Amino acid sequence: GLNVGDKVGLYIVEQEGEELCLPANEDFYLMNSEADGSLSFADGEKHVYPDNPINIYGFYCEGMESAPADLLAVPVSIPNVQETEEALLSSDFLYVKSEKRHRGEEKVISLNFCHQFAKMKFHFKTDTPETVDLNKITDFKVINVIQEGNLNIATGELALGNTVDDIEARVAEDFAVIVLPQKIEGNRVLFHFLLGGEEKS
């Protein structure tokens, strides 16, 4: 979710006719996330759209605080080391698309951001804790993951790139990694780790 002070990029697009007007670079505004869950314009100005309804597109990703050079192909990626909670959170990408033709008389416009990437959760358990010590799991990696792509802000569609690498994950009884949504071939080894120095997959 969003925290106080997070910078959110929004495209506020006037709809001048019946045809859908898609976002353009000049529609971009940087917003501040406030304590009450609202968003305010980072430039401190008041922006009014009295004549035409508006549609809204936007995103939040840690470190992205300016308009992308090409909003139809925004480079996105995940780090290959996600061993801390902070690294996990910074790997996320929130996206919103509201094509409801909002009008000025609406006092509140609610935006529902969604997680554009996928979270893989892992849970380890054993029926023989006397012989298998889960605390001795080390070097956990999700292997052969596509780690970069391009996101279309207008549609929310993700085009995967070609960079493939392993993701080093935090080892715990329950933990997760963030990945770009992608198909996993059947019977492919998804992860491996060491248990007491012995490799498992």
Locate predicted features.
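Short aromatic-acidic-glycine turn motif
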Residues: I143-T155
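Short, low-hydrophobicity acidic/polar segments
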Residues: G1-N135, T163-G186, L190-S201
